[in-house]
């Protein structure tokens, strides 16, 4: 649908190893990450950009990443996002995590979609995580990983 909306302004590259295609992955992880890349990274750029979706396995872990060539995230906001996500994965009682509650009450400051994805992955896989890399003006990479061997 987004391809129809933005036409040729946004290009997609998807790369998944064969062994990834055989694994069950948490639902609604990649789709909201791609939507975030479009909405927050590329939609305001007149040139559009590229979204690169990648999936691979290393040892007992499955990795999924979504990268964009968009606007990137301002440093202060990036730090808040990272802190919130780390709070989800570091907390045994992630549903009661104070930073996650702050995230839900202040959706404009920090991306609530990323917090929801972190919760979903943490709920399914104890040994999991999420990393966000971004430089303003250079794009963003969001990587989700989880242990599929447990």
What kind of feature is each model-predicted range?
Residues 144-150:
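C-terminal beta-strand of the catalytic ATP-binding
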Residues 1-131, 140-143:
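Two-component histidine phosphotransfer core
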């Amino acid at each position: 649908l987004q391809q129809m909306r933005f036409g040729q302004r946004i290009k997609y590259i998807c790369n998944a190893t064969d062994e990834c295609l055989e694994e069950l992955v948490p639902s609604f992880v990649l789709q909201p990450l791609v939507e975030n890349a479009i909405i927050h990274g590329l939609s305001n750029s007149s040139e559009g950009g590229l979204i690169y979706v990648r999936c691979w396995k290393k040892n007992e872990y499955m990795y999924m990443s979504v990268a964009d060539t968009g606007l990137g995230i301002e440093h202060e906001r990036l730090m808040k996002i990272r802190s919130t996500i780390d709070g989800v994965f570091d907390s045994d009682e992630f549903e009661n995590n104070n930073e996650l509650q702050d995230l839900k009450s202040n959706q404009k400051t920090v991306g609530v979609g990323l917090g929801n994805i972190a919760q979903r992955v943490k709920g399914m896989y104890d040994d999991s995580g999420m990393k966000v890399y971004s430089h303003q003006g250079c794009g963003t990479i969001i990587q989700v990983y989880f242990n599929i061997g447990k």
